[in-house]
């Protein structure tokens, strides 16, 4: 069973992101920022580079924040396989 989620950790943390020449703000929960950083380190790239990849690969009409969340879930699901 998963540990309980601390309410304070669910507060969105905004960060400015530079995607090419475009600057935007992404708001994620701290645990998702941590996961994104962990994934980037695992892949040997910066979090900024990972967000650029996610931005470039997302479908038209899908928000960047949603695309990041989906990427994180897919990354971890691929690693745990069938439950």
Q: Can you say where each PLM-predicted feature lies in the sequence?
A:
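A detector of short terminal or domain-flanking linear segments
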Residues: 1-20
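Amphipathic, hydrophobic secondary-structure cores in small proteins
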Residues: 18-72
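Short, solvent-exposed charged binding patches
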Residues: 73-83
């Amino acid at each position: 069973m998963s540990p309980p989620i601390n309410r304070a950790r669910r507060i969105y943390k905004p960060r400015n992101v530079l995607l090419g020449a475009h600057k935007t703000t992404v708001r994620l929960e701290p645990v998702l920022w941590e996961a994104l950083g962990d994934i980037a380190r695992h892949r040997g790239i910066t979090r900024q580079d990972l967000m650029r990849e996610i931005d470039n690969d997302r479908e038209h009409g899908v928000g960047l924040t949603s695309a990041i969340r989906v990427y994180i879930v897919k990354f971890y699901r691929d690693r745990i396989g069938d439950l």
